[in-house]
């Protein structure tokens, strides 16, 4: 649901994440010949932009929401009763070893360790718990999963990790890393262990970390000549004795799932049974159970006996399906699984299978009890006393298969007789059940309910059940919370459902969206209980998608990726937020300014739907590894922020909500009082001189009727954004131009009448930073055309529109030959209060830049048809007397990315694919080329190309001085830096692993690049 956002700043950003961001719709196959080009030509025809047709209005769709990528998916591990404290150290032969849970947090004395999905490992001083202070941070590349802390050393498990193995080969999977935090300001790496696949679950026994990982058969590169690999599951042991992380052993098995249950001496592993490695997902619904001996305190793994059972134990559900498998008594395994592989209907049958592992080398099935009508993913929980005093299973079917009564049955099974488990009691629960949490003779059931069958009224629900008599379970009470749509991370892991029986409190984090209040509804729910009743609950509203609520002394700490909040729960019915510390801001731009850096953040997805922030920090604190309190900040009205810099003045453009009259169908968003709302843009001047941050003047653009759910500045990640260009352009330092392309027509006596004021180019004059002024003009009123691609050349603003020469046949739009003529519109801003269109000139494509010596020598990118092949070129033409005379054409084969012009040189990346013929007529694996096109002699351009057929994928991200930065890999997991020179092709210099998955902006000061990476913050990259 999250949209990765790429803001345009002073450096053009490539449309990342699509195979063809510049030229055409992916997979298009032009079949029409283009008009020949020759020197001196001044009339041009081109192919229309991708997706345009007769009557098409152009422009990217308007999106509601903001920039960030993603909620935290971290669901680590930890104690289910209170904040876990750091263990004293590894086990020994004389001390019985205990199984410990990992988690995304750890409390050790006056230190809080928190594994933040965006900012990595964060260390806080909580000696003054009401005012926690960040005292150290270790950024992490990849997706932090969970950790354990021993004697100040954190062992962190990271998934989605790209890099190279010790032998230099490409590696994608998971790692376990040791981080010595004894000096939080100088965290050190104490070793790494490479773990195949994606780690699904972990446990600690003594001083050994055990992991289970699933590998779907990753392939590297383009896979030419490669075979398809079957999925595998691996268990590994990693020693952290003495604070040093080393891999001890690893065992790999065919299959998927990887559900494992850990005791002090054994791992019981469940994987999907594969009968045909060539079709691993088409086999029977069977599961392989294996007994793995881990009795060696050093971490040696020994596989003992195993067998195959006739059901599929699913890895879906909370904690990687952990609750579908039990081995608590170290002798009998209990497994609940479906007899069809995907359990896709309410008619599928489950099996409750009991396996006798009294002899670990020769297990045997003791019983298999069929259970009908459980749906796709049943909620199960085994509650077995290792000493044998009781053995139960709590079971509820998937809520999607329970009919329309709003009730879900709770069934209790007695497992005390391995050969004859039986159903002993039932009762009804409300809604759908996600997770069961046993609490002695009581049981918590976590789920959600629906109101009137609408998903936007889905509340989190906690029900409390007396199971002291399993034959007659009785519901003791329930509480609902999270108005609107709500969810809890406890649906994914029991570690988020914190119970402190001594306090009679259960703490459940939740997050959601309330459409009535048009706001996020996040925080902690405090549920009060006694052995006989659920007596009440209270809500502490905090920021961010809350992952945990943990007890620390007399306070609760609310942990989200965005914020750490301190909650006073002395009155559990009315908990009070004492303080809140921001942990991760969605940084959209960072402008270095000598000794300081100005960071703009806009956090709509992070739960601030009305405000952005400009912060000025010491340049040495750009990465924010500590919080030393030396930064200054100022709030800015609106969200979806972008900034245009003019010295120490920042022109911040945001989307703001404005009350409007309600139309017959409403305007979409409504305030709590029923007032209709619409969006528009606001420009706020921020003065960051002398290390400060002060608001100057502001101005708001007119509201558009189609702006209810949308904003501007969202482009940059669609393949067709190359021709739209930016919707906001800075001209001459102190002016901004805005493209409004949401045309509307009013009824007229002779047909629709174009309403100019609703579709215009707006000019904001910022020459007086305390009193900005607005003016506008209409670029075109043609009902069938398009305009856009605003571009500033010095103090001159240009826009582009096109005219159809041959339009698609509406009855066969894909089989029609059609062409357009592009026209360059020069916008006269001599009088900014009265802008007007000067001359309109036919040109060969869309404007990408101009000569630094002669502003009438213009550079264009064009797309045209040449039989079955796509053709792209960079054309140079001389603007003279109402015409643009062609000087040269340089053809570029393949898909072309963004074109960046600097000092009479055009830079772009071109992707070649295997369906494109090379000069020798043979097919090769896809590869990219980085072009440096020297246009200083417009009649004789020189194209210098850097390429490596083995490199594969990459797009030009930006050009900063004598460096070009190219994305590396399918996801933006790294960048390649190329050194630029006047008389040679770009030369590869270094690769840098990047934080996060996208870049909002790239800036440079001296020998350091600053990559603005959203919630991952600012990443300084020191150039070699």
Regions found by a protein language model. Give the residues of each.
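C-terminal motif of bacterial Sec signal peptides marking the signal peptidase cleavage site
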Residues: 22-25
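Bacterial N-terminal signal peptides that target proteins for export
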Residues: 2-18
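Feature marking well-ordered beta-strand scaffolds used for ligand recognition
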Residues: 27-1024
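Residue-level signal for mature regions of secreted extracellular proteins and peptides
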Residues: 19-20, 669
């Amino acid at each position: 649901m999250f949209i990765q956002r790429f803001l345009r700043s002073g450096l053009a950003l490539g449309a990342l994440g699509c195979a063809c961001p510049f030229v055409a719709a992916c997979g298009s196959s032009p079949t029409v010949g283009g008009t020949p080009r020759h020197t001196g030509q001044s009339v041009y025809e081109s192919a229309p932009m991708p997706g345009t047709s007769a009557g098409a209005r152009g422009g990217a769709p308007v999106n509601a929401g903001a920039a960030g990528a993603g909620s935290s998916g971290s669901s680590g591990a930890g104690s289910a009763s209170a904040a876990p404290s750091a263990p004293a150290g590894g086990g020994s032969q004389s001390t019985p070893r205990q199984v410990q849970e990992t988690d995304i947090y750890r409390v050790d004395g006056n230190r809080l360790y928190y594994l933040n999905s965006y900012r990595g490992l964060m260390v806080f001083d909580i000696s003054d718990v009401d005012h926690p202070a960040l005292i150290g941070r270790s950024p992490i590349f990849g997706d932090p999963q969970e950790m354990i802390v021993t004697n100040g050393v954190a062992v962190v498990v990271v998934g989605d990790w790209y890099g190279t193995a010790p032998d230099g080969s490409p590696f994608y999977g998971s790692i376990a890393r040791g981080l010595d935090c004894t000096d939080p300001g100088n965290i050190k790496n104490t070793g790494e262990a490479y773990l195949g696949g994606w780690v699904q679950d972990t446990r600690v026994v003594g001083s050994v970390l055990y992991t289970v990982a699933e590998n779907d058969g990753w392939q590297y590169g383009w896979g030419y000549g490669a075979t398809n690999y079957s999925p595998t599951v691996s268990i590994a042991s990693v020693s952290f004795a003495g604070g040093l992380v080393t891999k001890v052993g690893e065992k790999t098995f065919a299959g998927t799932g990887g559900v494992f249950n850990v005791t002090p001496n054994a791992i019981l592993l469940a994987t999907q049974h594969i009968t045909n490695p060539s079709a691993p997902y088409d086999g029977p619904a069977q599961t392989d159970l294996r007994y793995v001996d881990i009795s060696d305190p050093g971490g040696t793994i020994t596989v003992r006996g195993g067998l195959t059972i006739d059901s599929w134990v699913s890895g879906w559900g909370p904690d990687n399906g952990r609750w579908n498998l039990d081995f608590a008594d170290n002798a009998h395994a209990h497994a609940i699984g479906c007899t069809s592989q995907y359990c896709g209907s309410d008619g599928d049958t489950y099996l409750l299978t009991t396996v006798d592992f009294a002899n670990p080398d020769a297990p045997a099935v003791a019983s298999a009890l069929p259970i009908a009508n459980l749906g796709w993913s049943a909620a199960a929980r085994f509650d077995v006393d290792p000493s044998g005093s009781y053995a139960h299973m709590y079971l509820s079917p998937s809520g999607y298969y329970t009919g329309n009564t709003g009730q879900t049955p709770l069934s209790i099974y007695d497992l005390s007789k391995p050969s004859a488990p039986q159903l002993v009691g039932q009762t009804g629960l409300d809604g759908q059940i996600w997770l069961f949490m046993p609490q002695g003779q009581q049981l918590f059931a976590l789920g959600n309910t629906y109101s009137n069958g609408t998903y936007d009224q889905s509340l989190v629900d906690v029900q409390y059940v007396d199971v002291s008599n399993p034959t007659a379970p009785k519901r003791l009470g329930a509480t609902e919370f999270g108005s609107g749509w709500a969810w809890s991370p406890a649906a994914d892991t029991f570690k988020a459902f914190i119970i402190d029986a001594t306090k009679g409190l259960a703490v459940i984090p939740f997050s959601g969206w309330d459409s009535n209040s048009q706001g996020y509804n996040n925080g902690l729910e405090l549920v009060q209980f006694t052995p006989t009743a659920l007596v009440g609950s209270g809500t502490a509203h905090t920021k961010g998608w809350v992952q945990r609520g943990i007890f620390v002394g007399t306070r609760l700490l609310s942990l989200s990726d965005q914020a750490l909040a301190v909650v006073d729960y002395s009155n559990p019915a009315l908990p009070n937020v004492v303080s809140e510390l921001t942990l991760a801001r969605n940084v959209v731009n960072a402008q270095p300014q000598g000794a300081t850096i100005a960071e703009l953040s806009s956090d709509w997805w992070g739960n601030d739907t009305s405000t952005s922030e400009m912060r000025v920090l010491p340049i040495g604190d750009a990465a924010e590894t500590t919080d030393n309190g030396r930064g200054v900040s100022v709030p800015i009205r609106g969200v979806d922020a972008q900034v245009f810099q003019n010295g120490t003045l920042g022109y911040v453009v945001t989307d703001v909500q404005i009350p409007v009259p309600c139309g017959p169908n409403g305007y979409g968003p409504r305030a709590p009082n029923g007032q209709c709302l619409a969006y528009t843009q606001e420009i706020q001047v921020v003065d960051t001189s002398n290390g400060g941050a002060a608001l100057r003047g502001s101005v708001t653009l007119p509201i558009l009727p189609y702006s209810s759910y949308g904003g501007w500045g969202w482009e940059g990640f669609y393949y067709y954004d190359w021709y739209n260009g930016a919707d906001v352009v800075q001209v001459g330092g102190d002016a901004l131009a805005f493209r409004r392309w949401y045309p509307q027509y009013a009824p007229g006596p002779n047909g629709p009448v174009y309403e100019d004021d609703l579709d215009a180019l707006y000019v904001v004059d910022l020459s007086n930073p305390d009193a900005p002024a607005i003016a506008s003009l209409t670029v075109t009123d043609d009902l069938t055309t398009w305009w856009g691609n605003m571009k500033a050349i010095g103090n001159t603003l240009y826009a582009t529109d096109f005219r159809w020469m041959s339009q698609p046949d509406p009855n066969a739009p894909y089989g029609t030959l059609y062409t357009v003529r592009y026209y360059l519109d020069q916008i006269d801003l001599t009088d900014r209060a009265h802008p007007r269109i000067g001359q309109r000139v036919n040109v060969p494509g869309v404007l990408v830049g101009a000569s630094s010596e002669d502003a009438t020598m213009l550079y264009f990118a064009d797309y045209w048809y040449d039989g079955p092949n796509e053709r792209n070129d960079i054309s140079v033409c001389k603007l003279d007397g109402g015409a643009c005379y062609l000087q040269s054409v340089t053809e570029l084969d393949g898909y072309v990315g963004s074109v960046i012009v600097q000092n009479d040189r055009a830079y772009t990346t071109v992707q070649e694919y295997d369906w494109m013929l090379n000069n020798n007529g043979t097919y090769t694996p896809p590869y990219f080329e980085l072009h440096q096109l020297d246009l200083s002699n417009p009649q004789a351009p020189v194209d210098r190309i850097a390429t490596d057929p083995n490199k594969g994928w990459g797009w030009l991200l930006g050009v900063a001085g004598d460096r070009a930065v190219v994305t590396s890999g399918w996801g933006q997991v790294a960048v390649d830096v190329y050194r630029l020179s006047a008389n040679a092709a770009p030369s590869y210099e270094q690769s840098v692993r990047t934080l996060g998955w996208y870049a909002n902006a790239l800036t440079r000061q001296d020998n350091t690049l600053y990559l603005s990476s959203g919630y991952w913050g600012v990443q300084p990259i020191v150039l070699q």
